[in-house]
């Protein structure tokens, strides 16, 4: 323990003079001298109750002793027979335990987190004990309050603020809300009372017991102003009245307050769970909610003005960088995202701050600085208050109390303490300003050119716009004005509340100043106004763009680059959330991490809620698609990587859909009993075409077939027993249903299962043996071609190995070259007649001669032709690596393979970019002439001349 500083050693002599006989100096430990010198509250208390000091020295405070508070208090109240006795015992108990907490805190015997826990638990113990004693007394006097079924009704108490969060400070008010479950009246009393009357009277008595000063002091100052309607509202409300109020009239600051609400006492009872479930939707919105930022900013502005008005300087709670700003930072994330991130729904600040860091909503460095600052400030606040058990957050101006705080905070002197304090508060202020801003940051709004506001609000004529639109052509200027006018007319048809109008009037001048600075202003504005029309009645999305200038800039650049992205954002505004973090927006998920990220994403949704699961799958896909497209546009992803990401994403989706379908089927029917003898599920999904070949585009459908290895005699082992093969058929049907069901977020993927044996006429799911037999004995050459680009995208190792063996066996069959050449060429000519040359003077990149399909047919032909001699050709299912294999195995010259690869990737890159522009896959006839000529020559060489 650090020795007392010089000023405190001098003060100790004053303390000694006050001590009574039983507390002679020589009987005191060094610890006792330190605490008595530091805290006048402890000093006064032990002078009045010397036995407390004896107890402290023989049984020092422990970190976990809060667990005994209830038992200790129960013993203290065991002989209480009237309200006066109750009040006296509660006050003495509170003072005795507060002395123990002050002792532990001054000497740093336990952590600051433990101090906060002890202070909060003490308050809860006292509140609950007082409530329970009074409830019994009131029931004896007036009867027991019951509902219509005759069930006893309890009084539930919501602890708000720091009490609710388990973070009560040393000398604090307690904010409470009283509630009771159902209407009814008392039973068993001398006269019948309505439940509302019973609980109102009981509530009044409870406040008096806790709050009224007596010769023993008070227990806690009780503040009931956070209840619905404040001081003018009923003291106690029924659950129904509470629900009505918060649904119809609950304000933003009440949501802010309710984040920390905690039910005192038995928080796991039926009524407690009912109350908690009722309040949760009000506090945590299911959708991301950015309206809270302005509300919190307004509240912070009010507090800042109050600080200035009351001349509050050196206030570690309300001042810049103080405790309140840390609380605001944490609650911004809770209120914005808490509905979708259960880890943010904690009432306590430090666990929530850890969750914020874990979700990467704040950098690790910022989160750690806030954590350290919070613990520093809370310790300083509690020490300050424990000097005199006084509710203050203002640093002292007198030398004695400054010396006390410097010593207790482990600093040599006051300047060192204030220096460290300044560092912490500066760190907090920086994070706060970056996130929430404040009145002082509104100068940007004031400095925004008045002309942009006029352009938005005053519907300027073209002549008036010259200064801001001078760089645009006359046609573009006219178009911009028309777009603004049309957008305003569209707004007049919509129901937009005053808040929505206010946000739009703030957003649009900023948006116009950014958009109209671009050369392509008219095109970009047309895409963005189309998006805005879809979200104007949903103020929370407007607020996102208004509050986060970086998000607005990303929106503008992405919409300018791609109408596909603009359409996606307009259709699914939930995706706007992705614009907030450029680190993730332009950095798609690592290719091997999609499955894990999706699994984590789905953990937020109840497994048994199919509708939410389907919605979550679609939302995840769209968010990932946006990130891939953003990286594509930014040039950070080459074409091959774009397809890799789209393919990995699809595989993650298949994995999740099969998992969902499997769980649903097993719940209904049990598992096929042959699985008892083997690992895995006996089921595989095979991807063909673009999926099999790692070549998916932005809007590609999935070519899938389903395989199982279920014996004929297998049955399921559930209560509803069905044939094992029937189980797998229903599983496949369920998978198709989950992919194609249209929710508010659209469908997941179009799935085409017609490549299965016998096509649309065949069974949806095929046994592995039947598949092998079909491929050997019935399949056409084009089906063997399709097999070149096929691979298992979901399945257990046994079935995967079986499919790979069948594929290898079929592809390595000896084939007569001329016959194969003719069959492949004729199939291609049929396709070209059916799909190609539909656009006169245009080149269809995929279907026309010299396009992508020709390259695919060349590689498929060469694999089928030569795999018998060179089995290594069967290794890969994508065209680029097949071309590499053809060169490595001396079938195609390396120069030709590389040239075809370049042509192939160039054409695919163009298809990706046309998709981003929402344009069809054809271009002018004079495009890609060199690539097409190269492909034609290769086609001639391999499929015509040989």
Curated annotation (Swiss-Prot):
EC identifiers of the protein: 2.7.7.89, 2.7.7.42
Record keyword DNA-binding present: no
Cofactors (names): Mg(2+)
Pfam families: GlnD_UR_UTase (PF08335), GlnE (PF03710)
InterPro entries cross-referenced by the UniProt entry: GlnE, GlnE_rpt_dom, NT_sf, PII_UdlTrfase/GS_AdlTrfase
NCBIfam families, sorted: PRK11072.1
Job of this protein: Involved in the regulation of glutamine synthetase GlnA, a key enzyme in the process to assimilate ammonia. When cellular nitrogen levels are high, the C-terminal adenylyl transferase (AT) inactivates GlnA by covalent transfer of an adenylyl group from ATP to specific tyrosine residue of GlnA, thus reducing its activity. Conversely, when nitrogen levels are low, the N-terminal adenylyl removase (AR) activates GlnA by removing the adenylyl group by phosphorolysis, increasing its activity.
Protein name, UniProt field: Bifunctional glutamine synthetase adenylyltransferase/adenylyl-removing enzyme
Source organism per UniProt: Escherichia coli O17:K52:H18 (strain UMN026 / ExPEC)
